[in-house]
């Protein structure tokens, strides 16, 4: 969903209109994934680097997220979509955290489509969080430094239980 604001600006529209159109693209993409039998889909929604945007744009993005969850959650659940949010919870408003938790809980047993939404996500942040969890395991003695392999490191990522993309 990166580039929605630039897309809108390039057409003389407000940036928020690009983000609104991005939400519509998400709806179409999820529908198509379900129709095609796609089992796993990951969408990047809000980067942890997006906090540097103007406050009004951040406000608009969060308002769109709230509206999307409130409007679409029941249909996603009805269609068997399992929702999972990856990224850090730090800095998110309490109502956003509740929406995330409610969506995750409601859809936890669904299996038609595993929809992972990277929200307040950044690759560097994920690597730092994985390294921190590994350091904790080493400090507790449950993992030795010699046990840290690329595969082991990957098992500490937010997406460790997702299939590795093959295309």
Positions of PLM-derived features:
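Flexible, compositionally biased loop and terminal segments
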Residues: 1-167
């Amino acid at each position: 969903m990166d580039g929605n604001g630039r897309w809108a600006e390039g057409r003389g529209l407000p940036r928020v209109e690009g983000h609104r159109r991005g939400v519509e693209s998400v709806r179409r993409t999820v529908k198509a994934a379900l129709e095609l039998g796609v089992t796993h889909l990951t969408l990047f929604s809000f980067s942890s680097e997006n906090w540097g945007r103007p406050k009004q744009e951040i406000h608009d993005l969060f308002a769109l997220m709230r509206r999307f969850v409130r409007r679409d959650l029941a249909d996603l659940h009805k269609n068997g979509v399992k929702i999972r949010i990856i990224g850090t919870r730090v800095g998110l408003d309490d109502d956003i955290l509740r929406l995330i938790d409610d969506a995750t809980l409601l859809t936890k047993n669904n299996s038609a489509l595993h929809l992972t939404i990277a929200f307040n996500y950044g690759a560097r942040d994920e690597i730092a969080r994985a390294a921190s969890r590994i350091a904790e395991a080493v400090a507790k003695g449950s993992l030795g430094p010699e046990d840290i392999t690329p595969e082991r490191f990957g098992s500490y990522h937010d997406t460790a239980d997702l299939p590795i993309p093959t295309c």
